[in-house]
From Swiss-Prot:
This is Bifunctional purine biosynthesis protein PurH. Pathway: Purine metabolism; IMP biosynthesis via de novo pathway; 5-formamido-1-(5-phospho-D-ribosyl)imidazole-4-carboxamide from 5-amino-1-(5-phospho-D-ribosyl)imidazole-4-carboxamide (10-formyl THF route): step 1/1; Purine metabolism; IMP biosynthesis via de novo pathway; IMP from 5-formamido-1-(5-phospho-D-ribosyl)imidazole-4-carboxamide: step 1/1. It comes from the Bacteria. Transmembrane segments: none annotated. Belongs to the PurH family. The lineage of its organism: Bacteria, Pseudomonadati, Chlorobiota, Chlorobiia, Chlorobiales. Pfam families: AICARFT_IMPCHas, MGS. InterPro entries: AICAR_Tfase_dup_dom_sf, Cytidine_deaminase-like, MGS-like_dom, MGS-like_dom_sf, PurH-like. One of its GO terms (cellular component) is cytosol. Residues 1-149 form the MGS-like domain. GO terms for molecular function: IMP cyclohydrolase activity; phosphoribosylaminoimidazolecarboxamide formyltransferase activity. It comes from Chlorobaculum tepidum (strain ATCC 49652 / DSM 12025 / NBRC 103806 / TLS). It catalyses: (6R)-10-formyltetrahydrofolate + 5-amino-1-(5-phospho-beta-D-ribosyl)imidazole-4-carboxamide = 5-formamido-1-(5-phospho-D-ribosyl)imidazole-4-carboxamide + (6S)-5,6,7,8-tetrahydrofolate; IMP + H2O = 5-formamido-1-(5-phospho-D-ribosyl)imidazole-4-carboxamide. GO terms for biological process: 'de novo' IMP biosynthetic process. The IMP cyclohydrolase activity resides in the N-terminal region.
Length: 523
């Protein structure tokens, strides 16, 4: 079948960007244009010959525009197979004219529900019915019909029509049809999520639909032989997008591994939003140093001293604008990425001298609500994000000795961090500084040994420190190892059948211990 020449177009758009120029070009190629509502008024006002869709249907737009294109003469004109004799006969008998081009974009439902003060009624009125119906009909018959949903495709269609005798190519029609089904799928996903939330549906539900749209292409994944990309995601709690939260100000493109580390570093620094100056240093998604201090530079020095080797090539996040003193200290070593809510005067210029370093501006907080998804060979695991916190007054003191105010401050500091570290996790903290990080071990005792060893490597004295465990101590041995290191207070979930043994061991060593009642495994 030859590529059909476009003779008749149906145009109805919410986003009117470029539509006047596009239709003016169509008219110059003798394309007959039919339109609706505001689009029709705009085109006619611009001096373009365009007719109301009612001239095709013989039926007026009714019910405040809810019904205008849902008509057999529209969908028959879109769906008719042009070289099918029966279809041609049905079209003649019913006065149906073929429609060769559909230009439609949909009511802005997502933009509408993103408004803080949107009402349910307003959201409902922005659910497009006729638009998706026309798009799907046109896309189904892509052998004969060209369908355009994206302003960015106007130029391609016009160029092909000019060079192809008024027709588009089969390859282009098929590509545009694929975009239609991706669009309508995402559109319906957003509506379904909004309706479920409005209905008060709790939990993940029996079915879930994710809306994913590529935001960034990447050279490769975790390793060079793996392909990768970053996708915007709408899981029903709003769109999660890198560019909405971050802006890369300097350096080469961010890699897949960079993105994982940025997520890890900012996830921890978010715990200290609004608190005194805090710094997080991350390597391979685990923190190798976290600290708070009266100044940002002091906080950085403390975080760095936790592990003076791992920060090389690492990622550093700050909860304050990066000042010149701190930037100069950071500049003493090579770091992959620096993330800050702002950069003070002169700092960017100084840091940009190292071309291999990326500088990232965090424009807004990370979203906390929502779901976490992990792909497996046998399906998708879905869980709520681990975002629940414990206030000091919710802690249960289970030992004879109460923690001091200083110990309590360190315990709360440690508990904010421990859930961001791979399990099993043992974390030593002193004076709002990580002193030893034991991460990702199969044995909790081994995690404790590693944390103690890391502290000894940089001559950090664990006497007077506190320890946090992401899960309960199954035996007293882990706690006794901490006591031997000089720990004075412990924070852990509790819940072991041997809790009493652990509590007795704590009392025997004059330790203060609190239970949170909340485990923080991270696999």
């Amino acid at each position: 079948m030859l590529d059909p020449v476009i003779k008749r177009a149906l145009v109805s758009v919410s986003d009117k960007t470029g539509i006047v120029d596009f239709c003016r070009e169509l008219a110059s190629m003798d394309v007959e244009i039919f339109s609706t509502g505001g689009t029709l008024k705009l085109l006619q006002g611009a001096g373009i010959v365009a007719q109301s869709i009612s001239t095709i249907t013989g039926f007026p737009e009714i019910m405040d525009g809810r019904v205008k294109t849902l008509h057999p003469k529209i969908h028959g004109g879109l769906l008719a197979v042009r070289d099918n004799a029966e279809h041609q006969k049905a079209a003649r008998e019913n006065g149906i004219q073929f429609i060769d081009l559909v230009v439609v974009n949909l009511y802005p439902f997502e933009a509408t529900i993103a408004k803080a003060d949107v009402t349910f009624e307003e959201a409902i009125e922005n659910i497009d019915i006729g638009g998706p119906s026309m798009l799907r009909s046109a896309a189904k018959n892509n052998e004969s019909v060209t369908v355009v949903t994206d302003v960015a495709d106007y130029a391609t269609v016009l160029d092909e029509m000019r060079s192809n005798g008024g027709a588009t190519t089969r390859a282009t029609r098929l590509t545009l049809a694929a975009k239609v089904y991706a669009l309508t799928s995402r559109y319906d996903t957003a509506i379904a999520a909004y309706m479920a939330k409005a209905a008060g549906v709790k939990g993940a539900g029996d079915t879930m639909t994710l809306k994913l749209e590529k935001e960034l292409s990447m050279r490769y994944g975790e390793n060079p032989h793996q392909s990768a990309g970053l996708y915007k995601m709408d899981d029903g709690n709003g769109v999660r997008s890198f560019s909405a939260i971050f802006e890369k100000l300097h350096g080469k493109e961010l890699s897949y591994n960079n993105m994982l580390d940025i997520a890890a570093a900012t996830g921890i620094i978010e715990e200290f939003r609004g608190e005194e100056p805090s710094v997080v240093i991350v390597k391979h998604t685990n923190p190798c140093g976290v600290a708070q201090a009266p100044t940002l530079c002091e906080a950085y020095r403390k975080a760095f001293s936790t592990d003076t080797q791992a920060p090389f090539g690492g990622i550093i996040a700050f909860n304050r604008p990066l000042d010149m003193e701190t930037a100069s200290a950071v500049n003493e070593i090579f770091t992959e990425i620096l993330i800050a809510p702002a950069f003070e005067d002169g700092v960017l210029e100084m840091l940009m001298k190292k071309k291999d370093r990326r500088l990232v501006l965090q424009k807004q907080p990370l979203p906390k609500a929502g779901w976490e998804f992990k792909s497996t060979p046998f399906g998708m695991l879905v869980q709520e994000r681990d975002s629940k916190t414990v206030a000091p007054e919710e802690l249960k003191v289970v030992t004879k000795r109460q923690p001091t105010a200083e110990e309590l401050a360190d315990l709360m500091f440690a508990w904010k961090i421990v859930r961001h570290i791979k399990s099993n996790t043992i974390l030593y903290v002193k004076n709002r500084q990580t002193f030893g990080v034991g991460a990702g071990q199969m044995s909790r005792v081994d995690s404790s040994k590693i944390a103690r060893w890391k502290a000894s490597e940089v001559a950090l004295d664990l006497r007077g420190s506190v320890v946090a465990s992401d899960a309960f101590f199954p035996f007293a041995d882990g706690l006794l190892a901490a006591a031997e290191a000089g720990v004075t207070a412990v924070i852990q979930p509790g819940g072991s059948i041997r809790d009493n043994e652990v509590i007795e061991a704590a009392d025997a060593n004059n330790l203060a211990m609190v239970f949170t009642g909340m485990r923080h495994f991270k696999h």
